Amino acid sequence: MCRVKDMKHLNQRTMKLVNELMSFCYKYGSTNLEIKVNTNTKETTINLKAFGISISDKVLESSNELLSAPRCHEMEEYYWNLSGDNDLDTELTLVGMMIDDYSINYNKDEGVLEFNIKRLN
């Protein structure tokens, strides 16, 4: 069972992940977001759907590459506080290091991008 301090850190990291995903979506023109977060003792899932977004195939490919990086607990412990603190194109770099599984679905015709993120607790 998670201790209170551990839950606090878990919640803070979840908020950082959501913030980074939102920043990415706003950067590419999203006008409306739907966010669903579910946390239990085993995992946290984040489902974010962005509407009115326009990204190129290159950005989509790059996003997949960044998110597919293996989770790195040591880097996460050190760097998670850095997310959201600069204007560099790093939104998804830290997200990739902090998650265990993901999927991205993009409907170009409708301008809808969906992230499904899983993080084992």
Per-region residue spans from a language model:
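Conserved ATP-binding N-box helix of the HATPase_c
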Residues: 8-38, 89-98
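Glycine-rich/acidic phosphate-handling loop/turn and adjacent ATP-lid/helix
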Residues: 46-92, 120
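Beta-strand residues in well-ordered beta-sheet regions across diverse protein folds
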Residues: 47-49, 105, 114-116
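Conserved beta-strand core positions
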Residues: 31-33, 44, 102, 113
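Glycine-rich ATP-binding loops of the HATPase_c
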Residues: 100-106
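Short, well-structured hydrophobic secondary-structure segments
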Residues: 33-49
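N-terminal presequence-like segments and adjacent domain-start helices
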Residues: 1-9
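Short C-terminal beta-strand
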Residues: 110-120
